[in-house]
């Protein structure tokens, strides 16, 4: 029987990701939802993306959500306001560029990245709903209907979401805000960013019946 999993923020921590995949009994038919922030801050963003591309071939039912760091990289490459100059670089983007052998102080363009990497990062979804769960990188704005949620909130919201109840009728599984352990506020929210890049653990949870069935941390 297929299982439902969610994996927290990786942030270029390929070593954590490799150990996690060796630990969790994933099967090809399982749904595995990655919560976003594959890049930035950690030492090996390029290796993480390459690993996930290969992983997707073996586990085709994966879902990859967009995190705010994928959003920042896209804005940086497009020259969008708010992510010019040092803004992206100082928020962990410098480590990503270095992992691709690019100079953070130089001119960087999309063509400098390996084929398929940016497509993978930028074709990510904002949300995924399944089996009574809503998966999203940062969270939702309580009191706002799902179809009216802003992109900003889905990618960036923090305490305004997970310290409050909501009326979506779904358990929201989120990352983005690094916490010392898995956050549980049933039936409203489950937080799975446990700060792998900050010396914490990388977390994967198996989900069902509105709750965590099993948790794996490396």
Predicted segments with their positions:
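Divalent-metal (often Zn2+) His-rich catalytic cores of metallo-beta-lactamase-fold enzymes
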Residues: 71, 78, 134-149
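N-terminal active-site segment of His-dependent metallophosphoesterases
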Residues: 1-51
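Active-site neighborhood of divalent metal-dependent phosphoester bond hydrolases
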Residues: 41-125, 161-163
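Conserved beta-sheet core of the metallophosphoesterase superfamily
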Residues: 144, 150-216
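Divalent metal-coordination and catalytic microenvironments
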Residues: 9, 37, 52, 67-68, ...
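Beta-strand-turn-beta hairpins that frame and shape the catalytic cleft
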Residues: 1-4, 128-134, 186
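Short, well-ordered beta-strand micro-motif
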Residues: 129, 135-137, 204-208
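Active-site environment of divalent metal-dependent phosphoester hydrolases
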Residues: 11-15, 40-43, 71-73, 142-143, ...
């Amino acid at each position: 029987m297929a299982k439902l999993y969610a994996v927290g923020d990786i942030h270029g921590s390929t070593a954590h990701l490799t150990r996690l995949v060796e630990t969790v009994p994933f099967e090809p038919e399982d749904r595995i939802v990655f919560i976003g922030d594959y890049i930035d801050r950690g030492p090996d963003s390029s290796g993480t993306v390459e690993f996930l591309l290969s992983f997707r071939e073996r586990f085709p039912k994966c879902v990859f959500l967009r995190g705010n760091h994928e959003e920042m990289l896209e804005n940086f490459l497009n020259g969008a306001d708010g992510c010019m100059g040092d803004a992206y670089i100082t928020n962990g983007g410098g480590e990503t560029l270095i992992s691709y052998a690019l100079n953070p102080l130089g001119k960087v363009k999309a063509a400098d990245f390996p084929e398929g990497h940016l497509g993978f990062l930028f074709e990510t979804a904002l949300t995924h709903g399944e089996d009574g769960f809503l998966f999203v990188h940062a969270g939702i704005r309580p009191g706002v209907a799902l179809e009216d949620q802003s992109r900003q909130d889905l990618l960036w919201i923090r305490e305004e979401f997970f310290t409050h109840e909501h009326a979506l009728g779904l358990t929201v599984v989120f990352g983005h805000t690094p916490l010392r352990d898995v956050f549980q506020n049933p039936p409203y929210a489950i937080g799975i960013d446990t700060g792998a890049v900050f010396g914490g653990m990388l977390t994967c949870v198996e989900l069902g019946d509105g709750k965590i069935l099993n948790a794996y941390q490396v």
